[in-house]
UniProtKB/Swiss-Prot annotation:
SUPFAM superfamilies: Nucleotide-diphospho-sugar transferases. It comes from Haloquadratum walsbyi (strain DSM 16790 / HBSQ001). GO terms for biological process: F420-0 metabolic process. Residues 92-107 have a biased composition (Polar residues). It is an enzyme of class 2 (transferase). This is 2-phospho-L-lactate guanylyltransferase. The gene is cofC. It catalyses: (2S)-2-phospholactate + GTP + H(+) = (2S)-lactyl-2-diphospho-5'-guanosine + diphosphate. Belongs to the CofC family.
Length: 316
């Protein structure tokens, strides 16, 4: 399965700002993205990162004219839209063995090293400030990096730069299903904050029959979707699960639904963090623990929450 994973590093996870700083939210979002990518790749699926252009530019250390390369001399394989206004192609960069989605006016050469920089912002000045707040202990931010490099095949990740909102950006990718020159008969979209994802859960989704297969989120959103019909388009505004289900049935498309705790739990707010510590065996839980975030039982309610212990705090 070819899986599109939308991701942005522009002010991610703002609802966690009561427990994490801005740079910490970025680092935690990257840790969750690691878990999603490594899980998908462990089952042999291909991953396409759908990210803002500026993220790619920063990762490749390219600016202005350096990012604009005449594509007429590039041998490309068309893989996305058939329309002229949002047509994309995929270039095989022989030097890096990496595939890059590009617009018809420019190509961004993304090496495996740049992929890892996208997943870990080495140049974020906030990291230094946040580190100083924690008495110089930088380990909590970088704890996942070495493991990630071992688990993620960065040279097998496709990168598509798109600055539009989530819905039009994803629909541009889905246009490939109606392009007879592309090899796609089905595409999946999986959100980058599904920290509880496992190979078993994702295979349940991909094995489910239906023109459209939905994995609803707890708040009414669509956390993952498989599209096997070229006419279907997503709309992530509001209660998108209900809207996607209705749109599919209105078009006489068969719909499969996967009721999964692991796919249904997107991590957005502090009350979601206990789920990561309880059920994630990857980098997301390691990152939280390294940041001093622990499970905490509320004696009054009997429910499990979280507490944060700073590195310089005395242990009771």
């Amino acid at each position: 399965m070819h899986v599109i994973v939308p991701y942005t590093d522009v002010s991610p996870k703002t609802r966690l700002n009561s427990i994490l700083t801005a740079s910490e939210r970025t680092a935690f979002a990257q840790a969750m993205l690691y878990d999603v990518i490594s899980t998908l790749q462990s089952n042999g699926h291909t991953v396409e990162l759908l990210i803002p252009t500026e993220t790619v530019m920063q990762a490749t250390d390219q600016r202005d004219q350096e990012t604009i390369i005449d594509s007429t001399g590039v041998s490309t394989e068309a893989v996305s839209t058939s329309t002229s206004t949002h047509a994309d192609t995929t270039e095989h960069n022989a030097a890096s063995d990496n595939y890059v989605s590009q617009s018809p006016t420019h190509t961004l050469s993304v090496t495996p090293e740049a992929i890892m920089r996208i997943l870990r912002d080495d140049d974020d000045p906030d990291n230094e400030a946040s580190t100083q707040e924690r008495d110089g202990d930088k380990e909590y931010i970088d704890i996942t990096v070495d493991t990630a490099q071992n688990q993620i095949q960065s040279n097998q990740i496709v990168v598509t730069a798109d600055d539009r909102a989530l819905t039009p950006a994803v629909n541009s990718c889905l246009n490939r299903l109606s392009d007879t020159e592309t090899p796609f008969s089905e595409l999946a979209v999986v959100m980058a904050d599904l920290a509880l994802i496992t190979p078993t859960a994702i295979e349940r989704l991909f094995a489910r029959e239906g023109d459209i297969v939905l994995a609803p989120g707890r708040g009414g959103g669509t956390n993952a979707i498989v599209v096997r019909h070229p006419a279907f388009r997503v709309d992530y505004h509001g209660t998108s699960y209900r809207d996607h289900y209705q749109a599919a049935t209105d078009a006489s498309l068969s719909v499969g639904v996967v009721d999964s705790m692991r796919l249904g739990t997107d991590i957005d707010k502090p009350t979601d963090l206990p789920e990561v510590l309880l059920h994630n065996n990857g980098m997301s839980s390691v990152w939280l623990q390294s940041a001093g975030i622990e499970l905490n039982l509320d004696d009054n309610t009997g429910r499990v929450g979280i507490t944060r212990k700073r590195k310089n705090e005395d242990v009771d």
